[in-house]
Amino acid sequence: MEGSYLSAQENQPIPERLIPRSNSTSNLFALSSTFSKLNVRNDADYNYSNPNKKRHIYSGEIDCRSVTAARKFPVRSCSMTAAQQRKRTALFTVRERNSYHEGFNNDQDYVSQYQKPQYTFGVYKELTPYQLQRSKMKRSFQFPNGEIYKPKLDGKCTHSLKKPELNSRDSSLFKFSEKKGRNLSKDFVGPHNGTSVIHIPPNDTGYGVNSLELNTSVPSTIKSSVSSTSPISAVNTLTSLPESQTDDDDGYENKTVTISYCFENTVNEKHGSHIEKLDLSTKEKTKPTTNSGLFDRKKKTILGTEKYRCIKSQSKLKLGSVLKKLWRTSGNSNTKHGKKDTKRRRIPIDDMVTHSDGNSEAENDIELMDANLDGIEFDDDETLMDTDSIFDDLLSKENDKYDLRRRQLEIRQKLHETSHNDDGKVSFRDTEKHNVNEGLIDKTIIEEFSKLGEYIIDTRNQPPPRSSKRPSLDDNESARYFYNISTDLRQSLSGPISLPMHVGNDMVNRLRNDWEYIRFEDRRNSLPDSSFDKVETPPKPIKKDVRFAKEVCLASTWSSNAYERANPEFIMNRHRLLWMMKVHPSMNSAMNEIKLELNSYKKNEMVVHENSKCFTHYLI
């Protein structure tokens, strides 16, 4: 994979005061041979020549003089915000210095022996969609649906504090300067192996890097030859795209970086190799400036962030209001609760990292959101009313279930207490309760329930009332003969009927009123004789069909009139009684006594099969 191109404007004029005073101008572009590694191209030459042509700049044989790169290299168009554009442009800016002689000559008298060439280039490539999204997520923005995204501020600049890993091919070391305007002395000269030091002065804004300075001491008496093995050390920007170093031969993603070209300097051995190490001081990088404007923006950002977090907490207002109502026992507790909320929502200033460009957009979004939500007030009373009704319904259901089980147990206990003893006496406890509740009994209700006695029939002592349509037989023998005699004569009731023995005309006349045909079965004739028991006759197949019979078969059963049904008036009275109990709860005491009596009857007096007693229903 080929490396990225370096674009520059060839026809851009160089300021006169930045041109070094030299007798020869042919060595102004004597640069490192590492340019051939980067495949540096010129836009002007690229336009009129073949697009595949790559213009290389090789180093010359003569003395190396200072060269100052042009300001504001052209930036490839990409989808980025204005704040990110300004940060990237800051890397292409060359910090002007008063002197090229290590800061000691202030009258702009250039000395040809010690002149410091400064090179600052931006190596970049078109960002991938993943990189664009990642750079976008580093600052706050607003979604199309109105929601505001803001990155989490944990109070630590993890990207700037991360120590860059030095590649095996990178031998250059870095140092972030701690004082403004500090320069390297003449004694600190890059060693013979090609190492160099990048000097990054602090900027005025206090959060990024505006310029980078490359300080190398090159004696004029010795020709500076550029080492072909000099590596390229990349420093990532502190505020955006914090990735590892990029190399042209690697397949890593190219980001906006700053390239320092390392020159091989031939010096005396007495100077030694002085290498300044990387300073990872957290206090210096995150030290707030004394600028009043920056302090105001920081304070405004903190307030905006606090309001934004308060707005997010308002989504939990409904549940919080319910909890407040439960916890609100006194005025002091309410005051303490408010203090706790204030402490919980307070954000320490040390945990905030201000970005002047990125936070300006976030401040505008937060201020706009605060202006829209200032006049909104939440009605806690309505929320509490709705919540209370829900809780009341849930509690009432639970109470009903509990009361149902409790009442069932009480009924069984009362029935056990009111059970008669062997002497037929009622327990003393039940008698005492009856005396206490005697004054609460409503006579009208008792009268309504007294009608039940008319429909209660004791089936143990007497049979149900005899139906008028039931045939009357004198004795069991005649009844047996009546049910066993059968005839195949199907005659009309209008014609004469051959009656069997012991069947009177009066019974036949009664049956005519209900049925058209009357069949008499004589089981004595149908029974097989004992002499034919040994003879086996093959069974004849019986044809099964469905038909509507016009005859009746008499059997020992009861007629429909023998079973009395409930009176509709009683059902209406029962519904009216239940409605009165619901309207007047005071009637419950009298009703409970009646229910207790009915339940006692069901348990002790009502005749129930032994296997069906477990299915008995009691009134509750």
Swiss-Prot record:
The modification Phosphoserine is found at residues 472, 526. Residues 1-12 have a biased composition (Polar residues). Induction: By pheromone (alpha-factor). Keywords: Phosphoprotein. Residues 1-20 are annotated as: Disordered. GO terms for molecular function: actin binding. GO terms for cellular component: mating projection base; peroxisome. GO terms for biological process: actin cytoskeleton organization; cell morphogenesis involved in conjugation with cellular fusion; mating; protein localization to bud neck; septin cytoskeleton organization. To yeast YER158C. Acts in conjunction with the alpha-factor receptor to promote morphogenesis and adaptation. This is Protein AFR1.
